[in-house]
Amino acid sequence: MARTKQTARKSTGGKAPRKQLASKAARKAAPSTGGVKKPHRYKPGTVALREIRRYQKSTELLIRKLPFQRLVREIAQDFKSDLRFQSSAIGALQESVEAYLVSLFEDTNLCAIHAKRVTIQSKDIQLARRLRGERS
């Protein structure tokens, strides 16, 4: 192949600019118009783990006192009317109820893990109570 002489040509400035896709153009235009910033969201499970650590550290009662007191009085009325309770008695009842519920949920969680699940279901609570001998 014979060599040819190269002549100088005027530069066109490289490649011609491509047309932007509609979605890219819309994305670039949105922030300049003062778009609303989306609120920050944690990954699923992060807040749950934080709450677990928080409640495991704490010792305060988690059930509100007045609703619990009303429930106790309502249940007690079935046995005898005009019963009176010392505030310390209601406090002791609430303390024991919360301790019972926490241990029940621990056993329920073990039942769910045994079934290769991470979500507890009502059948896990039933199994935990049956294994404890509370329910036949």
From Swiss-Prot:
The modification N6-methyllysine is found at K5, K10, K19, K24, K28, K37, K80. Its main location: nucleus. Phosphorylated to form H3S10ph. H3S10ph promotes subsequent H3K14ac formation and is required for transcriptional activation through TBP recruitment to the promoters. Mono-, di- and trimethylated by the COMPASS complex to form H3K4me1/2/3. H3K4me activates gene expression by regulating transcription elongation and plays a role in telomere length maintenance. H3K4me enrichment correlates with transcription levels, and occurs in a 5' to 3' gradient with H3K4me3 enrichment at the 5'-end of genes, shifting to H3K4me2 and then H3K4me1. Methylated by set2 to form H3K36me. H3K36me represses gene expression. Methylated by dot1 to form H3K79me. H3K79me is required for association of SIR proteins with telomeric regions and for telomeric silencing. The modification Methylhistidine is found at H40. It is found in: Nucleus; Chromosome. Keywords: Acetylation, Chromosome, DNA-binding, Methylation, Nucleosome core, Nucleus, Phosphoprotein. The modification N6,N6,N6-trimethyllysine is found at K5, K28, K37, K80. GO terms for molecular function: DNA binding; protein heterodimerization activity; structural constituent of chromatin. The modification N6-acetyllysine is found at K10, K15, K19, K24, K28, K37, K57, K65. The modification Phosphoserine is found at S11. InterPro entries: Histone-fold, Histone_H2A/H2B/H3, Histone_H3/CENP-A. The modification N6-methylated lysine is found at K15. Belongs to the histone H3 family. This is Histone H3. It comes from Emericella nidulans (strain FGSC A4 / ATCC 38163 / CBS 112.46 / NRRL 194 / M139). The lineage of its organism: Eukaryota, Fungi, Dikarya, Ascomycota, Pezizomycotina.
